[in-house]
């Protein structure tokens, strides 16, 4: 528990400090591929108008904005993040969107009732949560029966060429970007370590299943440097018609 608390405090400091530069940093580190990946994921999701969505670890709101457009004026999107500064940037970006609400909170203790949302997403945020499984179980709890959960995250490439390129990128290139944008060694080291240490796609799929998601499928992007995990909460078949 002490390690988790220290971890959470460190992550909070990092994102409080890089909030104003986060979008630019994300574009540079991913070579803007995160936008391409998210568009593909949104296509796979097939979000319907009028639905309620929750974007966990919403950060500055990029996925929240995409969901807002997808659910339309009759739908609702809630974004939640534990960094107040990241949320401030997100509020500026979503100021004109009447169907968006951004709230401050913890992914491991979501402040929502059970069975509240049709979709729950988390993009490039799960790796920053101290306990992945706890967060996934919370996402399951607030998802409606039959609802969809989607995670878009960095992953560990399996193809030999991409594995070598990935290792070289994290050893030599990412530290340079980190030093340019981060204020301290702690910040850029965290960005590097959290990504490199994140579970591979098969291990994460097992976690989804352990969190009681069903029909979990995985889709890799760009040689496996990122992956989508999409699953569902089991429908409640105990109720009659």
UniProtKB/Swiss-Prot annotation:
The keyword Methyltransferase is assigned to this record: yes
Pfam families linked: Ubie_methyltran (PF01209)
UniProt record similarity statement: Belongs to the class I-like SAM-binding methyltransferase superfamily. MenG/UbiE family.
UniProt keyword annotation of Transferase present: yes
Pathways per UniProt: Quinol/quinone metabolism; menaquinone biosynthesis; menaquinol from 1,4-dihydroxy-2-naphthoate: step 2/2
Gene Ontology molecular function: demethylmenaquinone methyltransferase activity
Coiled coil spans: none
Enzyme Commission code(s) on record: 2.1.1.163
NCBIfam families referenced in this protein's UniProt entry, alphabetically: MenG_MenH_UbiE (TIGR01934), PRK00216.1-4 (NF001243), PRK00216.1-5 (NF001244)
Name this polypeptide is given: Demethylmenaquinone methyltransferase
Its job: Methyltransferase required for the conversion of demethylmenaquinol (DMKH2) to menaquinol (MKH2).
GO terms (BP aspect): menaquinone biosynthetic process; methylation
PANTHER family with a match to the protein in the record: 2-METHOXY-6-POLYPRENYL-1,4-BENZOQUINOL METHYLASE, MITOCHONDRIAL (PTHR43591:SF24), METHYLTRANSFERASE (PTHR43591)
Catalysed reaction, written as an equation: a 2-demethylmenaquinol + S-adenosyl-L-methionine = a menaquinol + S-adenosyl-L-homocysteine + H(+)
Highest taxon of source: Bacteria
Positions with a binding annotation for S-adenosyl-L-methionine: 60, 81, 106-107
CDD domains cross-referenced by the UniProt entry: AdoMet_MTases
Keywords on record: Menaquinone biosynthesis, Methyltransferase, S-adenosyl-L-methionine, Transferase
Broad class of enzyme this protein falls into: transferase
Listed InterPro entries: SAM-dependent_MTases_sf, UbiE/COQ5_MeTrFase, UbiE/COQ5_MeTrFase_CS
């Amino acid at each position: 528990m002490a390690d988790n608390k220290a971890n959470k405090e460190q992550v909070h400091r990092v994102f409080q400090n890089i909030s104003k530069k986060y979008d630019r940093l994300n574009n540079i580190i991913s070579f803007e591929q995160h936008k391409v990946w998210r568009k593909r994921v949104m296509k796979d999701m097939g979000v319907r108008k009028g639905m309620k969505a929750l974007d966990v670890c919403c950060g500055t709101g990029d996925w929240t904005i995409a969901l807002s457009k997808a659910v339309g004026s009759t739908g609702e999107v809630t974004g939640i993040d534990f960094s107040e500064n990241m949320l401030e940037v997100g509020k500026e970006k979503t100021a004109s969107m009447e169907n968006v609400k951004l709230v401050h909170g913890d992914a491991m203790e979501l402040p929502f009732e059970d069975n509240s949302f049709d979709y729950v997403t988390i993009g490039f945020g799960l790796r920053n949560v101290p306990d992945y499984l706890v967060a996934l179980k919370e996402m399951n709890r607030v998802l409606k029966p039959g609802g969809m959960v989607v995670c878009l995250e960095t992953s560990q490439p399996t193809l030999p060429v991409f594995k070598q390129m990935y290792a070289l990128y994290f050893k030599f290139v990412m530290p340079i970007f980190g030093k340019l944008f981060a204020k301290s060694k702690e910040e850029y080291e965290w960005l590097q370590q959290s990504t490199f240490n994140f579970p591979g796609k098969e291990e994460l799929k097992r976690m989804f299943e352990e969190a009681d998601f069903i029909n979990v499928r995985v889709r890799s992007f760009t040689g496996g440097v990122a992956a989508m995990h999409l699953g569902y909460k089991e429908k409640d078949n105990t109720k009659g018609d």
